[in-house]
């Protein structure tokens, strides 16, 4: 039948039982079958992203969970499914992915199950890096390059130069990560990697179309830019030529594996003289500043340029309005600058026309403006012309002896005044629609930072990962929870350099200088026909550097790209790195706090939610706060009440379960076990012989985090109730051990149902006064045997006033209410508050009808033994202070509100009569 494993079926069945059809579809799309995800499951998930009631974070978390599988098939299919949803699903999906700190932490993934697993693991690591980069680009740009409009009135063609210089390195970084997949036709051996390759191929066509539009826009405005901007634009153009070679190789693989040739665009090369012209213009700006405006044919400062350069209407291309500048003047001035360029090594590493003199001589007569030429070949990869361009022959770049290696070329830092692009770049028109908000505006406190390193094309990151992109109030700052990601894979621990103060300009030091032999540097004529204009478009594969994307452009500082789109509060980052110590402030108002937001999709009570609560992300679309990590297991949300204390012992005999509750229950004190004290038994003092080892009072309760972490007893926590409660109290009504509320607030289990009042009364007092008296005599008599040993172990200040004359048995009241303080009159000596007396947790204090410690009362020597067991209530043999009463309630703080009954006949008895 199918190749699904039993694990796949069980996982799908589990989600079916829980009712999550989306998660079930994810499991079905990521089975162990060595084939691409089935279309029916992908279509279902795509439809689910368009539904308003579908939880996008849950869908993404299920995909991430499947990507942690040990099998390369499941992981690869999870990546393919995620990519498919990023491309074809609702934009909410990629928005959510962009909001996360980390996506796929697969930089070290390796499936050792077989040789095929080793091979596929390599592509899984590269593929996950590209998906991370794709989401990162969306975060920086607030749009997906593959989704935006392309062509003459597309986004990249109508973008103002300042933004264009910022966006092109980001786009270059995404293309670099895609090209790094670097698969060969003989490696496309199974349906899973084939599905991934098809998605990458389609992405590359769209991304390169955007890339081409951006380069056209740069060339159109090149002669109107300031010097620093021209320098950045020239570097971007050089990198474009390098990437064009690699794109051609990728498309060649697509051709070999059988993709329809009509879907593969034919990339043709631009004339080499175009690069020379651009370099001469830049040299003119740097060497002959007075002739700047005449040489460029347009005013240099963009803020003073004509409105033609800042056309905001998407229906008109800027190129059509820039042609007003006299083109011949541009190149006449450039001709005068020919000696300057001849002294500089040729940047054209891949020039396929070594006969520069002949090429220039033939092209000297018809000199078109470069902007017009760029406009003509600008639609190379437009949506409608992709298929029509297959007939245009492309020059083979393989025969070139100077083809650049993938390693970065020798880079030298040119301290030319490139910082002007960062400091003096002014927005051309204030009415321009700002796609980026203030994303790329340097904050006032930022100093210009050196652009760190032209990285090799093998690196998908736009810059070195050492740059901390998340400094400042970045709402996406990685918190401690994402520290497990490898540095190169922590998706957003990198950003382009702050500004372009010293620009690292990769020069053509690896190529021999080719001096210009002709004084006329005019480019070759660009005809208006489709074939030649396309040839001009894609530009020659003359690459001077294979440096990766974001080095020379004035790059964004710590940026808040989604300031408007996702409405992140800037102060979110302040809470993104809390202390990871396990001591959680349960009652602090800011332990789990974050800026005001909508309802969170998941409970934020877990420890992980505490650590990461500040890194939330507010989606403006449906007004909800999306925490960054949704797979955190909430280990502390619902403590099991059954584990609070062991079941109460209901035997009527006097046998004591010494260790059952002491070591079986997760109570809040590590004190002796509660004792089942029988009113007719003399076994109450079996623990007395253990002395201080069992009786040492604990002043600070040990709180088990797994039980009572999130169910606080606020009264006990804030000191409004005496801290004398123990985890189990003696129930005078039936020899039962009734667990009580610990100071740390552990919940009372269902078994803590108080017995009926009638039974309490009958059992508590015994059948008559004789049995009660016998119980009193028996308990006190046996206690005396070990009283001195216990007294030695006990503090002198812990003594309580007891005695036969002071004991008043009370009839058990019919009802009691929780939290009512005792109404019995406390003796004047007990006026010391429990906090002042500092009674230990196990010590019976005022809540037991006993005065606190240190009140200076006289006391019988055997009484410390009776009350040394910190988890039991005093037996009836113990005398209470006159005016107080024994409480039958589950907690010492919940005393009966009944008034004390009339004087009891036993009140006149003295303990001395029985000794």
Swiss-Prot record:
Q: Which residues carry this modification: Phosphoserine?
A: 296, 300, 306, 313, 594, 600, 640, 646, 775
TM spans (from-to): none
Phosphothreonine-modified residues are 317
Protein's cellular compartments? Cell membrane; Membrane, Coated pit
Q: How does it sit in the membrane?
A: Peripheral membrane protein
Q: Where are residues bearing Asymmetric dimethylarginine located in the sequence? A: 873
Q: Where is the composition biased (Pro residues)?
A: 512-522
Entry's Gene Ontology molecular function annotations: 1-phosphatidylinositol binding; clathrin adaptor activity; clathrin binding; clathrin heavy chain binding; inositol hexakisphosphate binding; molecular adaptor activity; phosphatidylinositol-4,5-bisphosphate binding; phospholipase binding
Which Pfam families does the annotation name?
Answer: ANTH
| Keywords, in A-Z order | Cell membrane, Coated pit, Glycoprotein, Membrane, Methylation, Phosphoprotein, Protein transport, Transport
| Assembly and interaction partners | Binds AP2A2. Interacts with AP2B1; clathrin competes with SNAP91.
Q: What does this protein do?
A: Adaptins are components of the adapter complexes which link clathrin to receptors in coated vesicles. Clathrin-associated protein complexes are believed to interact with the cytoplasmic tails of membrane proteins, leading to their selection and concentration. Binding of AP180 to clathrin triskelia induces their assembly into 60-70 nm coats.
Q: What is this protein identified as? A: Clathrin coat assembly protein AP180
Q: Which organism is it from?
A: Rattus norvegicus
Give me the gene this protein comes from. Answer: Snap91
